[in-house]
């Protein structure tokens, strides 16, 4: 490889090759490889690659800390993490894309019940989509499509529970270029410029 893109998780690893393809960038032709580095390893792998003269760029979850990194080729997500980046689709009226992904991936489709404990752990404590803990379970088919709060609570929890390389691959397949979070488009284009 002439350049490496370092990502934190399974979902990013699965989705990035298809994101690149939708940006008209063939990772193989450009000699770009995507490496799943895990959370804290992105920085260390960038530093190691630089010692060997290998151009690379990495992205890690901001986890709510949006201060810029002191390393130019270490980027942070605009939102808290990969799953939160996907929630922007709800904000732009494209919730059906998330529903399509869920229905293809999950055998229970819109009938999947997420328990209150899981929702509170992610949607309330981690993301802050819920303003207070809830005591009831949620099922996607019961959520009004105008209830942005509950949609984000449901989807952020579901994507968090199910994050994996196969889910990332499906996300990469289902999102159009305009639906790919801009931070990832910019990162892939920057990687191409390093080759």
Language model feature labels by segment:
Residues 1-6, 10-195:
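Acidic, Mg2+-coordinating catalytic modules of nucleic-acid enzymes
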């Amino acid at each position: 490889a002439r350049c490496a893109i370092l990502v934190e998780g399974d979902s990013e690893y699965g989705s990035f090759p298809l994101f690149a393809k939708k940006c008209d960038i063939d990772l193989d032709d450009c000699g770009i490889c995507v490496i799943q580095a895990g959370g804290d390893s992105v920085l260390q792998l960038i530093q190691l690659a630089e010692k060997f003269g290998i151009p690379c760029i990495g992205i890690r979850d901001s986890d709510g800390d949006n201060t810029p990194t002191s390393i130019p080729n270490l980027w942070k997500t605009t939102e808290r993490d990969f799953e939160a980046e996907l929630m922007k689709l709800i904000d732009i009226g494209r919730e059906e894309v998330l529903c399509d992904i869920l229905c293809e991936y999950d055998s229970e489709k819109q009938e999947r019940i997420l328990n209150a404990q899981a929702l509170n752990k992610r949607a309330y404590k981690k993301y802050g989509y819920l303003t207070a803990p809830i005591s009831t379970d949620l099922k996607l088919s019961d959520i009004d499509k105008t209830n942005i709060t509950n949609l984000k609570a449901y989807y952020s929890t579901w994507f968090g529970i199910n994050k994996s390389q196969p889910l990332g691959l499906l996300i990469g397949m289902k999102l159009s270029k305009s639906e790919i979070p801009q931070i990832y488009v910019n990162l892939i284009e920057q990687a191409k410029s390093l080759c």
